[in-house]
Design a protein with these regions (language model features):
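Pre-P-loop entry segment of helicase/translocase ATPase cores
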Residues: 1-55, 117-134
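A broad, low-specificity signal for short, low-complexity segments enriched in glycine/proline
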Residues: 19, 45-49, 105, 124-128, ...
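A residue-identity detector for tryptophan
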Residues: 31, 46, 50, 113, ...
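Inter-Walker segment of RecA-like/P-loop motor cores
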Residues: 104-152, 351
Length: 434
């Protein structure tokens, strides 16, 4: 213990106290795409990609946030890991939507776009056309284009560190192989229950091959290199309610269990009575898939829905034509419905292929087998039915042909597609009538 000397009668001037420079508290600035760490599942996707796994496959149910994941992953890899990232979308609309999402996170992205098409509005993402498209030379960057556009470019000039393939179950294995010229690492994100790639060429020679170039890219990739592939599964849907999840999960995703995390959302009729999440209407059809009775039923149901109110966590409001979609199996059906409801310009009407990846609060679906008297052809494609039954958030009305149960009952016992349709139709017939 230190004591003062006895002869000291007054305090001596205090010696200056040496100052020690204390380290400053570091400021942690958020980096582009950092929200990907907020969920342990999406964080695993980032970890797998950043770790250098040659292929990462992310199977997802409808409405699980695939587009958001792709945008966050690309922004994180470019902004935090300083990588050159390519994003391959399957349609121009998907590419534009991704450009908007990525542009909201980082200013290092560009959308490769043909000068022949009108320039889309993509805030935060520049439009790159012509032959002068390049990655930045001093930091990471992101280039977004359709798969077809990527295959038109020169891999020697646009080589990237990692290629993210959005809606990859819509891409063929042949397309994925061609994209391999751009990057040695690939991330495939998509929905395995939706429509397979549209292939117009002859594919009989690969009929029994699990790695045929016409097959969905992730399925063939797993068949060819399963041991080298990391798989991270998204197991929650934020779009579909519990009733819809219970309908489509066992029928279309038997190996991909998932649950609903959609916030409460429903419609009410003019009397305030809640509408069920799923309802159906049976129609007598005599003139095939183009029967006017089917078109009339769809149009009448849309008019009824436009008199309802939408209830969400944000409040209550009248349902508008911007909130409603009609999905059909055929272009001619969609055209007839669109013409009948032409006074509702914001109503979304299209085929399952056209509406794949889109959503609305309320949807009217024309059953793909309506008007058919056999189960041959593309009408029984499970992927098409899956898309048609999963575009809605609050309500789905399904217009059915009253003869369809008899048609499916007469199908061959080993017809797996017809068996899936029988299961789904039985569940639909147990929903309330409109």
């Amino acid at each position: 213990m230190r004591t003062m000397p006895h002869h000291v009668t007054q305090a001596a001037p205090a010696a200056p106290v040496p100052t020690v420079a204390s380290p400053q508290t570091p400021h942690h600035h958020p980096w582009p795409g950092q929200a990907i760490l907020n969920d342990p599942v999406t964080a695993r996707v980032l970890h797998a990609a950043w770790s250098g796994d040659p292929a990462v496959i992310v199977p997802s149910p409808p409405g699980a946030g695939k587009t958001r994941l792709v945008a966050l992953l690309a922004a994180a890899l470019a902004g935090r890991a300083d990588l050159r990232v390519g994003i391959a979308a399957q349609t121009r609309d998907q590419a534009v939507e991704l450009a908007r999402r990525v542009g909201a996170l980082t200013d290092t992205a560009a959308l490769i776009w043909s000068a022949k098409h009108p320039r889309p509005d993509t805030p935060g993402t520049r439009i790159a056309a012509g032959t002068g498209v390049r990655y930045p030379t001093d930091h990471g960057g992101i280039l977004i284009a359709t798969t077809a556009r990527w295959l038109y470019c020169d891999p020697a000039q646009l080589r990237c560190d990692i290629m993210i393939v959005d809606e990859s179950w819509q891409a063929t294995y042949g397309d994925l192989g061609a994209l391999g010229a751009y990057a040695t690492q690939v991330v495939c994100v998509g929905d395995p229950g939706q429509i397979d790639p549209v292939v117009t060429g002859e594919t009989r020679r690969w009929r029994t091959s699990p790695t045929g170039p016409h097959l969905p890219a992730p399925d063939a990739l797993i068949a060819a290199h399963g041991d080298a592939i990391a798989t991270v599964t998204l197991r929650h849907t934020w779009r579909l309610g519990p009733d819809t999840t219970a309908l489509i999960q066992p029928a279309f995703y038997p190996t991909l269990p998932f649950t609903s995390r959609r916030p409460p959302e429903h419609l009410t009729d003019p009397t305030g009575h809640p509408l069920p999440e799923i309802a159906h209407q049976q129609v007598a059809v005599n003139a095939g898939p183009g029967d006017p009775a089917l078109v009339t039923a769809c149009a009448d149901r849309v008019r009824t829905l436009l008199d309802t109110h939408l209830h969400t966590s944000e409040g209550t409001r009248a349902l508008s034509d911007k909130d409603v979609a009609v999905v059909c199996a055929h272009v001619t059906q969609a055209a007839a419905v669109r013409a009948t409801l032409a006074h509702h310009p914001h109503l979304l009407v299209g085929t399952a292929n056209q509406l794949q990846g889109l959503e609305r609060h309320a949807v009217v679906a024309l059953h793909p087998l309506a008007g058919y008297r056999d189960t041959e052809g593309h009408a029984t494609d499970p992927g098409r039915a899956c898309v048609m039954l999963s575009r809605h958030r609050a309500h789905l009305s399904v217009v059915l042909d009253a003869t369809t149960p008899t048609v499916l009952a007469a199908a061959e016992a080993d017809d797996t597609a017809a068996r899936t349709h029988r299961t789904v139709l039985t569940a639909l017939l147990n929903t309330p009538r409109t």
